[in-house]
Amino acid sequence: MKKYFILCLLFFGTLSLYAEKVSLKVYNSFQIIEVNDVLFLGYGNRVSEIKFENDVPNVSKIILEGTAFLKDYSFISSCKNLEVLVMNNITVDNFDFLLSCKQLKVLALDSIKCNQLPNINEFKKLEYFALTNSDLELCDSFINHGQKLKFINLSYNKISKLPKLNSDDNSLYFVNGNLVKPVEQKNYIFCDDISKNLPKEFMEYIR
């Protein structure tokens, strides 16, 4: 029993040792929290500013939902090891803060209001991209992307026309719930049941 207790102390001590300190501004004061490799802010939070203590925080996953009070997302640019970014019900001007996140594998955006769409061709390691429920009308810019990107989810937007894909494009484009009528092209998926074509590892990012 004593040995087990010591092992537990060592385990939690290690977690604390490698935890990242994050300052969250709520109203007019900052509060400091510790996270390991995941930063999550859910609906109902009143955070208006986020700062990492380290210049290059070891955070691999960030989930932001309904951050109505948060306007500046530049803190994400310091996360050089970021692999997963999920943003739901958020307003942003642009996605320039992502340009330094070269390790990004998953970018899942839902109910986003923005003035400038992300250039997914910048992320050569990206495997799954989603921009859903965001009143998107044109999707031409998303057919130019890295070779590792195999799954592009553009469901439930206002797309009325689909671009012609390159002959060597093997990616799947999920376009169910749009204005466009189904076309006979294997890359475009109109089925509402995305799970039939999307690997399980990405299903957790479906809204």
Mark where each language-model region is.
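Short, acidic/polar
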Residues: 50
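N-terminal leader/linker segments that initiate helical-solenoid repeat arrays
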Residues: 21-43
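Boundary at the C-terminal end of the N-terminal hydrophobic targeting segment
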Residues: 17-19
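Secreted glycan hydrolases and related glycan-binding modules that recognize and/or cleave
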Residues: 22-28, 197, 201-206
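Concave beta-strand-loop units of leucine-rich repeat
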Residues: 38-47, 58-71, 75, 81-93, ...
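Sec-dependent N-terminal signal peptides
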Residues: 4-13
